[in-house]
Amino acid sequence: MGVTLDLARAPAQPLAPSRPNLSGMTRAELAACLVELGVVRPEKAKMRASQLWRWMHHYGVTDFEKMTDVAKETRAALAEVCAISRPQVVERQVSKDGTRKWLIRMAPGIEVETVYIPDVGRAGALCVSSQVGCTLNCTFCHTGTQALVRNLTAAEIVAQVQVARDDLGEWPSPKEDRRLSNIVFMGMGEPLYNLDNVAAAIDIIADNEGIAISRRRITVSTSGVVPELAALGERTQAMLAISLHATNDELREKLVPLNRKYPIAELMAAIRAYPGLSNSKRVTFEYVMLKGVNDSPAEAKALVNLLKGVPAKINLIPFNPWPGSQYECSDWGTIERFAAVLNRAGYASPIRTPRGRDILAACGQLKSESEKLRASARRKLAAGG
C-alpha cells in the first residue's frame, strides 16, 4: 500500500474560490454565467461556452492561458472573474492490486472517498460517491455507519472523475484504450436521494465533446428508492444496478432497512418497468454473500424465481470485513455452489474479486476508516505530537 499524503499535515482548506468555478456547470449554466459576468456578449455565449467546455472536459485544462483558441483579452477577463478549480486531494492510497483510493475534500468538513478499480488490460471503473455519508443504515455496509452530512453537487460528482483523470494521466479524453472506461455510482450515499445532481453530473460526464464516457458505461446503483426508478431511467439512460442481497422481505428488512418502505414486490414491479430494459440493457443485481445468512442453495433458487423474466445478471460479492461488523464472508465453496445454481438457470453470475481490501477501498468499506484516521491525527496534533 502506498500513502502519498499525510492526513495530520493536511488541514482543512476552503475549496470554493471567491470566483465562480466553471468546472461543474452544465453547458447552459456555463453560457449564462459568462454573460452574467460580462465576459462575452449574449450572441457569442454559446460558442464561447463550447470552447471552454472542450478545454475543461476534453483536455482537462485548469489554466485559461492554455486555451489557445480563445482570444488573449478574453482569457485575461476570464481569469479575473472566474476559476476552473479542483477539490483538495487529502490522501491518495494505492493497493497492492493496483486499486487507487482518494480522500477528496470538497469543502471544510465535506470529504468523500473515490475508488479506481483497474480491470484486465487497460480498462477500469471509477466508483464515485453521490452523498457525504448515508441514511440507509444497511447492516453489512461500513459506509452506513457514517451519518449523512449532505448531498454532493453535480460539480462535486464530476470533480471526482476529474481528479481520477488527473492522477491517471488521461487528458485529453482518449477514444480507445482508456484506463478509466466505466463510471459506477456505488460509493458513499444513495444516488436516488440526490437524483437531480446525479442526473446533471451524468449529462456532463457523457457529453461527447468532453469526458465522453458513454451512458451505457455508467451504472447507477440503488438500494431501491422505488418512486425515483423511472425518473432515473428517463433522465439519465444509465445502466441500473440494484443492491438486493435477499429474496424475502423479512431478511431484506434486516439487511437493507429501506425495504420496510419499499418491499420487494414493489421494487420488482418498478424494475420490470424500468425504461429501456432489454436483453442488451440488463439490470445488475448485487448480492453480498454473508455466511449462514443468505447463502444457502434454497436462497439461490429463490433468487432465480424472484428474477424470472427480468433481463439480468447477478454480481455475487464476497463480504468485505470491517471493524465491528456482525457478519462473516461465506466460504468460497459455498459462493461457487450458489453461483452454479444461478448459472444453470441461465443467469450470468460473476463472483466479484475483492479489490483494494488492504486500503479499505472494497465494496462496503468506504469512509469510516478515514474518519478514524483523521480523528487520530487531530488528537496527535492537540497533544503536540
Curated annotation (Swiss-Prot):
Cofactor note: Binds 1 [4Fe-4S] cluster. The cluster is coordinated with 3 cysteines and an exchangeable S-adenosyl-L-methionine.
Keywords assigned by UniProt, alphabetized: 4Fe-4S, Cytoplasm, Disulfide bond, Iron, Iron-sulfur, Metal-binding, Methyltransferase, rRNA processing, S-adenosyl-L-methionine, Transferase, tRNA processing
Record-annotated Radical SAM core domain positions: 120-352
Chief site of localization: cytoplasm
Binding site for S-adenosyl-L-methionine: G189, E190, S221, S243, L244, H245, N320
Subcellular location: Cytoplasm
Active site: residue positions: E113 (proton acceptor), C363 (s-methylcysteine intermediate)
Uppermost EC category: transferase
Disulphide bonds in the chain: C127-C363
Catalytic activities: adenosine(2503) in 23S rRNA + 2 reduced [2Fe-2S]-[ferredoxin] + 2 S-adenosyl-L-methionine = 2-methyladenosine(2503) in 23S rRNA + 5'-deoxyadenosine + L-methionine + 2 oxidized [2Fe-2S]-[ferredoxin] + S-adenosyl-L-homocysteine; adenosine(37) in tRNA + 2 reduced [2Fe-2S]-[ferredoxin] + 2 S-adenosyl-L-methionine = 2-methyladenosine(37) in tRNA + 5'-deoxyadenosine + L-methionine + 2 oxidized [2Fe-2S]-[ferredoxin] + S-adenosyl-L-homocysteine
UniProt GO MF annotations: 4 iron, 4 sulfur cluster binding; metal ion binding; rRNA (adenine(2503)-C2-)-methyltransferase activity; rRNA binding; tRNA (adenine(37)-C2)-methyltransferase activity; tRNA binding
EC number: 2.1.1.192
Cofactors demanded by this protein: [4Fe-4S] cluster
One CC-aspect GO term: cytoplasm
Binding site for [4Fe-4S] cluster: C134, C138, C141
InterPro entries, alphabetized: Aldolase_TIM, Elp3/MiaA/NifB-like_rSAM, Methyltransferase_A, RlmN_N, RNA_MTrfase_RlmN, rRNA_lsu_MTrfase_RlmN/Cfr, rSAM
Additional facts recorded: Reaction proceeds by a ping-pong mechanism involving intermediate methylation of a conserved cysteine residue.
Function per UniProt: Specifically methylates position 2 of adenine 2503 in 23S rRNA and position 2 of adenine 37 in tRNAs. m2A2503 modification seems to play a crucial role in the proofreading step occurring at the peptidyl transferase center and thus would serve to optimize ribosomal fidelity.
NCBIfam families: rRNA_mod_RlmN (TIGR00048)
The protein's name: Dual-specificity RNA methyltransferase RlmN
Organism: Phenylobacterium zucineum (strain HLK1)
